[in-house]
Amino acid sequence: APQFVGGLCQDGSGFLYLCSGDKVYRCDQKGVLTVYSEGTYDEPMIAPNYPVFDENGGLYVSDSGGWGDDNGKIFKILPGGETQLWSDTPKEFPNGLCISPDGSYLYVVVSLNSPRVERIPIDPEGSAGIRELVVEIPNSVPDGLAFDSEGNLYISCYRPDSIFRFNDDQGLETVVHDYEGTMMAAPTNIAFCGDRLNDLLSSNLGRWHITRYDIDACGHPLNYPIVE
């Protein structure tokens, strides 16, 4: 990629979609990159951060904007590359994304002012509803999201070195915390991997490595649509 790569995802044909610089790229099986989206004419992308597919091939992309500039937004890229400004909020550095297990909400990490997770209803026609607060995470910089098969939401935090689990009944609980910052070291995105989706992995920006966590949980399967 031409610049630092933020988040990435894969479609059902094996193409990769990655956020780099001010664009979203599509990468084929030979490693050839093409520009998939630069935003819209009126709203060009500034700092696309993380992409996630819905089941129909719509690609939601958080554009974090500038750190502390409160100019973030969320784009939706339709199959083929046509791009819409899907939501102009949250503005305070929208970061990691995930689709709810039933496909009815887009969950969004908001890293700043104040750090939290929100969700935005996905209306039947695909437009954005009114955003809702899910949970606040004081004194942190949340970054990544993932659901497990039981509907629990996992939230990785760049600061401090922690992963939290949230559900409506038990609230927010700490799953992993590394006060030394050695095994985790500024975790960013997280994902459930493996044949049974029972390996939780985090990418760690602080020491440029990947950490595996044995947490006795399996991930909810992601969407891998065929995108023409």
Residue ranges and their predicted role:
Residues 23-25, 72-75, 116-118, 162-164, ...:
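A short loop-to-beta-strand structural motif that recurs across blades of beta-propeller domains
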Residues 30-32, 79-82, 124, 160, ...:
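Short coil turn/linker residues within repeat-based beta-strand modules
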